[in-house]
């Protein structure tokens, strides 16, 4: 039995959800789980049911469907390696969505006691909260937007799976682009990308722009407060190589301004490479005065402009503000 536990614990440690956990730390949890095997189309969780269990998916995709009163269900694909069913357990509330196996699924099922074991693993409570918040936020409809060149893209808050899409997606972020963004010649690590994409939407808010409603991420923009509920936040942008020079960064700044006003951020600061002229021009429009911070690096602080200065149609401003409100309300429930 001990040998079987060690094998299962090692299998658990291989899941993306348990990144950083040693197999030995997962042995108590392994004894509390039972095997899961599901065929395509099988309902694993039903919206509205009591929350008694969670599931860890080793292989196979599942689809999470959230029924809404005023429209069709909103569907999100969840890749293997992650947990499902955690939101209702964290909130001690009925299921918030229906989960169906999209492919043959193999994994494990755990009860509330097993979930409590996970919560007591170092760092796992915060990880669970971030995942749950993002899944609630996933039920926000992407906003179709038109940039300076007349092209249409989609704007939405960052969602689960964007780490994988950025690492392995079709949109190229060249060494030069990454250098300007991260001030390093090395490709950002998965750990850094997980920090950048696993956010709380209140102190760390990220908009992404996609090619098509379900398409790849082509750009992102974020603000990160200097402390909980602080009025100062750092801003940063990344735009895929083939999408630069189209006004996407300027558009994303407008969206950040709307969201920042909503959450009470009053000043932005930015730390950029001296030759990152695209970012500097965006900040210059807000009245930036640049100060050298280090060799090849400059920084600035600017006031967050009022929303009525953003060059968007009132309807679009309302959509961005509404999406900000919904995502923050979702994660605070």
UniProtKB/Swiss-Prot annotation:
Q: Which UniProt keywords apply?
A: Acyltransferase, Magnesium, Metal-binding, Transferase
Annotated Gene Ontology cellular components are: cAMP-dependent protein kinase complex; cytosol
EC main group: transferase
What SMART domains does the entry give? Answer: cNMP
Protein origin, superkingdom: Bacteria
- Where is Mg(2+) annotated to bind? 211
N-acetyltransferase domain location is 153-317
EC number(s) in its UniProt entry?
2.3.1.-
Against InterPro entries, the record matches this protein to:
Acyl_CoA_acyltransferase, cAMP-dep_PK_reg_su-like, cNMP-bd_CS, cNMP-bd_dom, cNMP-bd_dom_sf, GNAT_dom, RmlC-like_jellyroll
Cofactor(s) this protein requires:
Mg(2+)
- Tell me which residues bind substrate: 237-239, 245-250, 276, 285
Q: Which Pfam families match?
A: Acetyltransf_3, cNMP_binding
The entry summarizes the disruption phenotype as follows:
Disruption of this gene abolishes acetylation of USP.
Q: Which residues bind 3',5'-cyclic AMP per the record? A: 85-88, 95-96, 135
Summarize the activity regulation.
Allosterically regulated by cAMP.
Q: Which Gene3D superfamilies match?
A: 3.40.630.30, Jelly Rolls
> What molecular function does GO assign, one term?
N-acetyltransferase activity
Physiological role: Catalyzes specifically the acetylation of the epsilon-amino group of a highly conserved lysine residue in acetyl-CoA synthetase (ACS) and of the universal stress protein (USP) MSMEG_4207. Acetylation results in the inactivation of ACS activity and could be important for mycobacteria to adjust to environmental changes.
| Binding partners and assembly | Homodimer.
Q: What is this protein called?
A: Acetyltransferase Pat
What species does this protein belong to?
A: Mycolicibacterium smegmatis (strain ATCC 700084 / mc(2)155)
